Design a protein with these regions (language model features):
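Small/aliphatic-rich secondary-structure junction motif
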Residues: 2-58, 69-75, 144-209, 232-241
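Active-site phosphate/pyrophosphate- and oxyanion-stabilizing loops and adjacent acidic/basic residues
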Residues: 32, 64, 122, 160-163, ...
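Structured loop/turn residues at secondary-structure junctions
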Residues: 19, 82, 108, 137, ...
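General small-molecule cofactor/ligand-binding pocket signal
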Residues: 43-45, 78-82, 133, 176, ...
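Structural beta-alpha unit
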Residues: 1-9, 33, 49-52, 57, ...
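Aromatic/pi-system hotspot detector in well-structured domains
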Residues: 30, 36-39, 44, 58-62, ...
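Gly/Ser-rich helix-loop-strand patches that form or flank binding pockets
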Residues: 1-13, 22, 28, 87-139, ...
Length: 308
């Protein structure tokens, strides 16, 4: 998707993985609610795993139902049936036909088939070089959206993507910056050299005045991150509110989203460098597994050129 503002809004290319499960139905309904630009293309993908030919007829019915749900005059739809292991097929198809967005259900219909399960969602999120939206039920529309940011370049790319994303006009966006407790961050950084883990026998003496000063600097940085992120969103005509949370980012984002009834969490798939942003590394994985809402992980071609 072109990030440059212009009077022409380019068509949006979406790849939707369908298996007939309630999560895939929710994904279809979510896409239906997006105000997509004219001539956008929705490719509805079905994957028949090895040795499961009897599943094909059920899958074809699910694909036809999804196409019927998504049918509209201004948007093109096509159905593609793939054969093989789901993660491999989706990644290969996405690599060949670069989407602006790939959408998959968090869980699949038949656990024994291992189609579109949480494990698959994690594989696709980690391997894809394009944005991936993992949907969950129940789906009640996109009313409240959280953009999680840690101030990294990848978070900036996520904000730029969301600024141009075709959200429903009534959707409210909240920018959340979750910063770990300073003592925890300082302790981890102190031991990041040859030892990458902590035990109770590894205390770190932290000077309180220094901590107080660092805490104030951290707050200032957090406010600056929120201000810059909101500026990016407003460039795409999306108004947003900002909030700073203290504590483990994944836990704070999950708790805040559940408390506020958030419908969609948006995050970059990678964060800061290992030392400066150690707390962000596992956030995307935790969001895939534990979020009650749908989650959009933003990876772009530009991100591939961002240093770790």
């Amino acid at each position: 998707m072109d990030m440059n503002k212009s009077s022409f809004v380019p068509p949006f290319r979406i790849q939707l993985a369908v298996d007939g499960s309630e999560h895939a139905v929710a994904a279809t309904q979510l896409i239906r609610d997006l105000p997509l630009p004219r001539n956008s293309l929705i490719t509805i993908l079905g994957v028949v795993p090895p040795g499961q030919s009897l599943y094909e007829s059920k899958l074809r019915a699910a694909l036809m139902q999804a196409e019927k749900t998504l049918g509209r005059k201004t948007v093109e739809t096509e159905v593609v049936l793939l054969y093989g292991h789901a993660a491999k097929q989706l990644i290969e198809y996405g690599s060949e036909h670069r989407p602006d967005l790939m959408v998959i259900g968090a869980k699949g219909l038949y656990a024994t088939l291992k189609i579109l399960l949480g494990g698959l969602a994690q594989q696709v999120v980690e391997q894809a070089h394009w944005p991936v939206l993992v949907t969950r039920t129940p789906y009640h529309g996109l009313r409240r959206v959280v953009l999680a940011t840690d101030g990294s370049q990848n978070s900036r790319l996520a904000a730029e993507y969301l600024a141009e994303f075709p959200l429903p006009h009534h959707a409210e966006i909240q920018v959340v910056h979750a910063q770990p407790l300073l003592e925890e961050a300082a302790t981890f950084a102190h031991h990041m050299g040859p030892i990458a883990y902590l035990t109770p026998s590894m205390p770190l003496q932290v000077d309180r005045p220094t901590l107080s000063h660092q805490a104030e600097l951290q707050k200032q940085r957090g406010r600056a991150i929120l201000a810059e992120t909101r500026r990016i969103l407003e460039g795409g005509s999306h108004k947003a509110k900002g909030i700073i949370l203290d504590g483990d980012p994944a836990s704070q984002i999950l708790a805040y989203s559940e408390l506020r009834g958030i419908d969609l969490i948006v995050a970059g798939s990678r964060g800061l460098s290992a030392i400066e942003g150690w707390w962000w590394g596992s956030v995307s994985r935790k969001l895939v597994h534990y979020a009650h809402s749908s989650v959009l992980f933003v990876r772009t071609e530009a991100e591939n050129n961002v240093p770790e």
